[in-house]
């Protein structure tokens, strides 16, 4: 039997979401006023970070199965900030604290500093409607 390859792995989702977060942070930095798009951008960043945070354990499961505990723990520690920043950003959005949103988005941009996005990317605008989705949760 041949191996079954899952094209939608957690690692690929994390890479795609990381690029989308970088794009959203750049767009959020361009915003001059707090409109619906700014709310969508901030909500999308929070939701995407939460999704990344939730996928860390499944990424690490294969390493733990092979007893690579140090590598697994290092990976967890490397991505621990994602869930924390997602929660802080969510609280800042719900309390309309846009100064904190700006500060957190700058910190998030620093975390994703090494990610390069091509000019002709195919990411689109994944943040459209994210605020409604965040409020609905």
Per-region residue spans from a language model:
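Short terminal alpha-helical segments
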Residues: 1-42, 46
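Amphipathic protein-protein interaction modules
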Residues: 57-118
